[in-house]
A protein has these predicted regions:
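Canonical P-loop GTPase G-domain recognition
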Residues: 191, 197-250
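Intrinsic disorder/low-complexity segments
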Residues: 316-326
């Protein structure tokens, strides 16, 4: 496909054309100069898609479960996008886990679009990029967006929180129920899923989660379900879709969906403003002054708080006499 002008690529992306859409998502991920114009064009068309987060520890079968969820939603006539947040190989710079390899059952369906968001060695900013990619997919007409993350670290939890509804996927073995309580997953879960439930211990793991939920102070009227699935054979997938749809109905009826989305937009705005202010600040501080500031800090001649205050106020450290240090 020949190179398109920015406005033409944006127009065709909003029309749902797959190749321009893929290029548009690359703009977002790589912070292309045209990404801002793209996102501005998309924003007014967002809000129609239900964004589902799928998170949990590695090895929980999330990719297989996401594939089955996409197939079930397609059977119901919904257009589905999958955003798979993958680790990146430090050698090749590409996604270590190829989403099209894992989800090749979906590749022939024009109603499904699959995209990796690679971490490129750092999770910084990935939650913002994921939310922006979902905006593009939302504006392009996808009705269900599945956001899969690879683990349960803080950054993965931030990515999961870009969703309207989040399912935490665990397996019967390895004390996942205990880990869920330790890793803060209780706070972000709208649904719990015990996948690979054809293995021994699935009922016991589900009961452990239910007991933990019962002991926890309720923060809303939504009763968090604990579901059993065996994604490799398709068992329990229909029930999981029904649970997601019940949660969407509850979110909508109670006004919680609107509140969550407003809160996410506020967090996103705050993150973008912080990023812009930092960029402006660093552009105003000469490199030599910045190095002097770091040296001042490293030699314990000034505290971080005092130095930060002075840098912000003056745009750089004031040179002064350096007292000899005792050895």
């Amino acid at each position: 496909m020949p190179e398109l002008q920015a406005d033409e690529l944006i127009r065709r992306t909003l029309a749902g054309e797959r190749v321009p859409l893929a290029r548009a998502l690359s703009w977002v991920e790589n912070e292309h100069p045209n990404a801002t114009a793209l996102l501005d064009a998309c924003f007014g068309r967002t809000g129609g898609a239900f964004r589902l987060g799928i998170t949990g520890p590695p090895g929980a079968g999330k990719s297989t479960l996401v594939t089955q969820l996409a197939k079930e939603y397609r059977a119901r006539g919904e257009k589905v996008a999958v955003v798979a947040v993958d680790p990146t190989s430090p050698f090749s710079g590409g996604a270590l886990l190829g989403d099209r390899v894992r989800m090749n059952e979906l590749s022939g369906d024009d109603g499904v679009f699959i995209r990796s968001m690679a971490t490129r060695g750092s999770m910084g900013g990935l939650a913002v990029h994921t939310a922006q990619a979902c905006d593009v997919l939302d504006a392009a007409g996808f009705e269900r967006i599945l956001i899969e993350t690879v683990g349960v670290g803080q950054s993965e939890l931030e990515v999961a929180q870009t969703a309207d509804s989040t399912a935490v996927v665990l397996v019967p073995e390895s004390g996942d129920a205990v880990q869920a309580m330790k890793a803060g997953l209780m706070e972000i879960a709208d649904l719990f899923v015990i996948n690979k439930s054809d293995r021994e211990g699935a009922d016991r793991a589900a009961q452990a989660i239910r007991s933990a939920l019962h002991l926890r102070a309720r923060t809303s009227e939504w009763v968090i379900p604990v579901l059993l699935t065996a994604a490799s054979i398709g068992r329990g997938v229909n029930e999981l879709v029904e649970a997601f749809e019940r949660h969407l109905a509850w979110l909508t009826e109670t006004g919680t969906l609107e509140r969550r989305r407003r809160q996410r937009l506020e967090q996103r705005l705050e993150s973008l403003v912080r990023e812009r202010l930092w960029e402006d600040f660093r552009s105003q501080v000469p490199e030599g002054a910045w190095r002097d500031a770091l040296a001042t800090l490293g030699e314990r001649r000034e505290t971080p708080n005092r130095l930060a205050e002075r840098l912000v106020r003056n745009g750089g450290p004031k040179p002064g006499p350096t007292e000899p240090r005792e050895h």
